[in-house]
A protein has these predicted regions:
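Anion-binding (especially nucleotide phosphate/pyrophosphate-binding) glycine-rich loop
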Residues: 1-16, 44-149
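Short Pro/Gly-enriched beta-strand edge/turn motifs at strand-loop
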Residues: 28-33, 152
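Short, surface-exposed beta-strand-loop junctions and turns on beta-sheet-rich folds
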Residues: 32, 66-68, 187-188
């Protein structure tokens, strides 16, 4: 990611953030019905390099899709390509929480197999939620809320009426651990 970031953004470097994809052993499709699930983080994930650019514009390069876009944080529509709508949606949801998001340059990639049910989208959302919380929010937003930012991004900008399991596993997941999650109360262990 770093070499692509340097190539696209005039040799500068930024901060690197990453979040994992997930597996789920029990309870697939029960999270959006407030049921119990048994997910865990996996080694595969999304990694992004991000650097504020002192503007209101996001300049984003998807390494895997070989695609680049620029969009304004003040644009009510956002980009049309789905992989960039995730980034746009996280920005907008963080701004709704009062995080003073500013423009940034980013390059991102992942090794979560697309379409394999391992939540590459949640890993992308979580990566950017962690990054924006760090860069612009002083890390004041708690992990529960960051997971909900990802879920709201799916609902409001992608059109997917998902539950919370994918984002929760990406935000709270730990290596070599599974978690029992009650999707109604968000209690887990």
């Amino acid at each position: 990611v770093r070499s692509r970031f340097i190539k696209h953004f005039d040799g500068s470097t930024g901060n690197v953030y990453a979040s994992p994809g997930r597996i789920n052993l029990i309870g697939e499709h029960t999270d959006y019905n407030d049921g119990f699930v048994f997910p865990g983080a996996v080694e595969q994930g999304i990694i992004a390099e991000i650097k504020p650019n002192k503007s209101r514009k996001v300049c984003a390069y998807s390494i895997d899709m070989k695609d680049y876009v620029e969009f304004s944080l003040d644009d009510e529509q956002g980009p049309s390509a789905t992989h960039f709508r995730f980034v746009y949606g996280v920005c907008r949801e963080m701004m709704k929480l009062g995080v003073p998001v500013e423009g940034f340059n980013t390059a991102f990639a992942g090794d979560v197999p697309l379409g394999a049910g391992m939540s590459s989208s949640a890993a992308l959302e979580s990566t950017f939620a962690f990054a924006l919380n760090d860069l612009f929010g002083g890390n004041k937003i708690d992990k529960f809320t960051l997971a909900k930012v990802g879920q709201a991004t799916e609902h409001n900008y992608i059109g997917t009426n998902c539950g919370i399991m994918d984002q929760f596993a990406s935000v709270f997941g730990k290596a070599e651990n599974l978690m029992r999650l009650d999707c109604r109360s968000l209690q887990y262990k």
